[in-house]
C-alpha cells in the first residue's frame, strides 16, 4: 500500500529535528547556522513557512521558504537519509511553491551547494534553471549555484 505523506506546518517541537537534519545534510563542514533557536524563530516568522513531513511522529523531511515582495526564497530543504528517493523532497517543494503562488509571487529562488551535484540535479528535475554562481556563499568556504523557477506569469492570469 502506498501512503502519501502528510505535509504540515512545523511547530516548535519539530525545531530540534529540523536543526539536526540541517547540520547533518546541508551545513556539513561549515559549522552550524540553523540551530534549534533559529528554526523556532523561522517557525514564528510571518513571512516564512516551515513545513515538515513525519512518519510515526518523527520528522522525515522539511522545507523553509521565505516570502518577499517580489519572489520567494527557498532557504532550506532536507529529507532524512532513510527516506530519500521516495518523492518527499518533491512533495515538500511543490507544497511550498503552491504557498508562493497563493501569496502572488511569480518566482522562487534558491542556492544549492556547488559541491552537491545531487541537490542541483534534483532542482533541475523540478523545473529550476541555473541563474549563476555565488562564490563563497556558504561561510566563505563553499560556492553556491543559484537556481530559479518561474511559477506563473501575470500573462497567465489575463482573461
Model-derived regions: residue spans:
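Conserved G/P- and acidic residue-centered "switch" motifs that form tight phosphate/ATP-binding loops
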Residues: 87-89
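Conserved catalytic-core motifs of GNAT/GCN5-like acyltransferases
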Residues: 109-111, 120, 124, 129-146
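Conserved short alpha-helix immediately C-terminal to the canonical SAM/SAH-binding motif I
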Residues: 92, 116-119
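Residue-level recognition of the GNAT/N-acetyltransferase active site
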Residues: 80, 84, 111-113
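Short secondary-structure capping/turn micro-motifs that flank functional sites
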Residues: 38-39, 116-117, 139-140
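Acetyl-CoA-dependent GNAT
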Residues: 4-5, 9-82, 93-99, 103, ...
Amino acid at each position: 500500500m502506498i501512503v502519501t505523506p502528510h505535509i504540515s506546518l512545523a511547530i516548535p517541537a519539530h525545531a530540534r529535528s529540523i536543526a539536526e537534519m540541517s547540520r547533518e545534510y546541508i551545513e556539513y563542514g561549515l559549522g552550524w547556522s540553523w540551530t534549534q533557536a533559529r528554526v523556532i524563530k523561522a517557525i514564528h516568522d510571518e513571512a516564512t513557512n516551515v513545513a515538515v513531513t513525519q512518519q510515526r511522529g518523527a520528522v522525515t523531511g522539511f522545507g523553509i521558504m521565505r516570502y518577499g515582495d517580489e519572489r520567494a526564497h527557498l532557504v532550506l530543504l532536507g529529507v532524512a537519509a532513510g527516506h530519500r528517493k521516495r518523492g518527499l523532497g518533491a512533495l515538500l517543494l511543490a507544497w511550498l511553491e503552491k504557498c508562493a503562488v497563493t501569496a502572488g509571487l511569480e518566482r522562487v529562488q534558491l542556492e544549492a551547494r556547488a559541491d552537491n551535484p545531487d541537490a542541483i540535479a534534483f532542482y533541475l528535475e523540478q523545473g529550476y534553471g541555473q541563474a549563476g554562481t555565488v562564490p563563497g556563499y556558504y561561510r566563505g568556504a563553499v560556492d553556491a549555484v543559484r537556481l530559479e523557477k518561474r511559477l506563473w506569469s501575470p500573462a497567465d492570469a489575463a482573461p
